[in-house]
Structures are given as structure tokens and as C-alpha cells.
Amino acid sequence: MSDKEIKLPIDTSLGKLPQKEKGSLLPIECKSPEEIRRHQLERLAAGFRMFSHFGYDEGIAGHITLRDPEYPHYFWVNPFGMHFGQICISDLILVDRDGNIVQGEGKMLNTAAFAIHSRLHEARPDVNAAAHSHSMYGK
């Protein structure tokens, strides 16, 4: 199965979200795949910060993935070794179904994240995001 040609790099340079800011709860109308991706990656980065805020991060353990809206056999994941509270859009890694880093060279892919989430995203095309965390509550 072949994907359409990937236009790389995908712009993630403006991905620095403030630690705390009020956002809109209203749905956002995104017209292009790039706008949809940007919106979803902003929410993913915010999700990492929320997990951190509520204590769902034990050291560097855990991962959250998001299926790419334009290339459904690819997903975004946090790099290994980066604390959830520090993650920005530009830190995220785009990985294909074979574990190849498509975008985010120089960053370390968490092999456990890939092993778990690649199977989940392959088996459940209706699932766009998944999370796995270690917290003080799980001890």
C-alpha cells in the first residue's frame, strides 16, 4: 500500500505554546490538511502539558501519539527522554508504520511507544490518538 508523496518537512517551527493560556472551546474550521495538522498538533502538545500538570508523567516514561490527518499510515509521537511538561510541536517526531523517522531526525524514537502505538493505529483506523503513561498513581 503506498501513500501519496509526502511533502517534507512539515512546518512545526511555530509550535511553542505558553505554559498556561485560555483557549477556545468552540470547534475550529480547518480548510486544508496543513491547518488540520497544525490544529491537532497544537492540541497534542497541550495534551502533554496537561498530563504533566495532573501528574500523569513519571520521569521520562509514557507517550501519546496522533495519526497524521493527511498521511494516515504515519503518526506523531513524543521523543524519548523529554518530559511531558517541556514538549512543543517542534519536538514531535513523525514516524511511518515501519518505525522510520520521517520527520524529526536527531531525535530518539521510543521503541516501546512505536511497538504499542503502531499496532494500535494499524488495527484501529478509527482511532486518531492514543496515550500511555506512568504516574505516581499507578505505583
Regions found by a protein language model. Name each.
Residues 1-35, 40:
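Extreme N-terminal flexible tails
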